[in-house]
From Swiss-Prot:
This is Pyridoxine/pyridoxamine 5'-phosphate oxidase. It catalyses: pyridoxamine 5'-phosphate + O2 + H2O = pyridoxal 5'-phosphate + H2O2 + NH4(+); pyridoxine 5'-phosphate + O2 = pyridoxal 5'-phosphate + H2O2. Belongs to the pyridoxamine 5'-phosphate oxidase family. Pfam families: PNP_phzG_C, PNPOx_N. Homodimer. FMN binds at residues 61-66, 76-77, 82-83, 105, 140-141, 185, 195. It comes from Shewanella oneidensis (strain ATCC 700550 / JCM 31522 / CIP 106686 / LMG 19005 / NCIMB 14063 / MR-1).
């Protein structure tokens, strides 16, 4: 077994105090996202999306956040993917943003609701044409005999859609994750990290400090 117990660092970039917390967690998330972008983090919108299968086995993957507001967090995916099939059976998910360079994490629990076709199409039309074509090519999570199979299909579809717009695939969609709780974690000195949990209660949010 490889021993990694000596890998550690101190957290020095500041704390998080209750007096600084807004009543609405989405305001704090917006501030932290802005600061993550300003810090030029690699892929600040990358989040881990966790789902479970029918046996209770959890699965995680990195997905890009595409939009957020007071209603929740939006991402897009192939509707034949493992994540989409698992969401169809159990729409309870968790999201996690690991902003290690600025010593912050955000963890979200909620329910994923499918977006309307109009909402999906609006976003799909903003994607680069090659990305639109790629959505047609990949049967996400299916087994491939070789990468060349995928590349061959890509160039085939690229030729097919050389002229005009690329239509929205019927098997491509998106989700709005409506949060029931949002936890903000800020690294602290001596491992005395600051953790605050927002829990939705009716029309307001309960705020609790958690032990690190």
């Amino acid at each position: 077994m490889t021993d990694l117990s000596d890998i550690r660092r101190e957290y020095t970039q500041g704390g998080l105090r209750r007096a600084d917390l807004p009543k609405n967690p989405m305001q704090l998330f917006e501030l932290w996202m802005t600061q993550a972008r300003d810090a030029q983090l690699s892929d600040p919108t990358a989040m881990c999306v966790a789902t479970v299968d029918e046996h209770g086995q959890p699965f995680q993957r990195i997905v890009l956040l595409k939009r957020f507001d007071d209603s929740g967090f939006v991402f897009f995916t192939n509707l034949g993917s493992r994540k989409a099939l698992q969401i169809a059976a159990n729409n309870k998910v968790s999201l996690h943003f690991p902003w290690h360079p600025i010593e912050r994490q955000v963890s979200i629990l909620g329910e994923a609701q499918p977006l309307s076709t109009a909402e999906v199409l609006k976003y799909f039309m903003t994607r680069p044409k090659e990305s639109q074509i790629a959505a047609w090519v990949s049967q996400q999570s299916s087994k491939l005999s070789a990468r060349q199979v995928l590349e061959g299909k890509f160039f085939e579809m690229k030729a097919k859609f050389a002229k005009g717009d690329v239509p929205l695939p019927s098997f491509w969609g998106g989700y709005l994750v409506k949060p029931s709780s949002i936890e903000f974690w800020q690294g602290g000195e001596h491992r005395l990290h600051d953790r605050f949990l927002y829990t939705r209660e009716a029309q307001a949010w309960q705020i609790d400090r958690l032990a690190p």
